[in-house]
Amino acid sequence: MATVLGSPRAPAFFFSSSSLRAAPAPTAVALPAAKVGIMGRSASSRRRLRAQATYNVKLITPEGEVELQVPDDVYILDQAEEDGIDLPYSCRAGSCSSCAGKVVSGSVDQSDQSYLDDGQIADGWVLTCHAYPTSDVVIETHKEEELTGA
């Protein structure tokens, strides 16, 4: 009767009453390629790299209030779309005002956007296409005309 002795860090040995020999070396196994997302990493790999928080996000839309759960590594617009909530957008790159909203309470990280200036951010303006929640947050959506004065 043979028994395998070993640990993940040491080579395994097969032991029997008549011999002690090293186990064959493991062979490489090809794994399926992950789907690559924004920034060259898959969403699942980004989530595995660190602990993840999920925040309550309340969106005040012209049709009424909607609440959703948004992980801290997902843009608010992306999660809203995944949950079937229709929000305005255009460039999805943080370089226009189509998805503009106003933070009523809470906080977001929108350091990836390039459209809003520091004063607008301090006044509570947010681009939902490039905003991660950093706390529970309430946002008034559909605010492009108010932001641009159009």
UniProtKB/Swiss-Prot annotation:
Tissue and organ distribution: Expressed almost exclusively in mesophyll cells.
Transit peptide segment: 1-52
Compartments (UniProt record): Plastid, Chloroplast
Residues covered by the 2Fe-2S ferredoxin-type domain: 55-145
Residues engaged in binding [2Fe-2S] cluster: C91, C96, C99, C129
Main localization of the protein described in the UniProt heading: plastid
Source organism, top-level taxon: Eukaryota
Cofactor note: Binds 1 [2Fe-2S] cluster.
Cofactors named for this entry: [2Fe-2S] cluster
Keyword set, alphabetical order: 2Fe-2S, Chloroplast, Electron transport, Iron, Iron-sulfur, Metal-binding, Plastid, Transit peptide, Transport
Molecular-function annotations in GO: 2 iron, 2 sulfur cluster binding; electron transfer activity; metal ion binding
Gene Ontology annotations of biological process type: electron transport chain; response to light stimulus
Gene Ontology CC annotations of this record: chloroplast; chloroplast stroma
Protein family membership: Belongs to the 2Fe2S plant-type ferredoxin family.
NCBIfam families: fdx_plant
PANTHER family according to UniProt: FERREDOXIN (PTHR43112), FERREDOXIN-2, CHLOROPLASTIC (PTHR43112:SF3)
Function text: Ferredoxins are iron-sulfur proteins that transfer electrons in a wide variety of metabolic reactions. Occupies a key position both for transferring the photoreducing power to Fd-NADP(+) oxidoreductase (FNR), hence the formation of NADPH, and for mediating the cyclic electron flow around photosystem I (PSI).
Protein name: Ferredoxin-1, chloroplastic
Species this chain originates from: Zea mays
Gene: FDX1
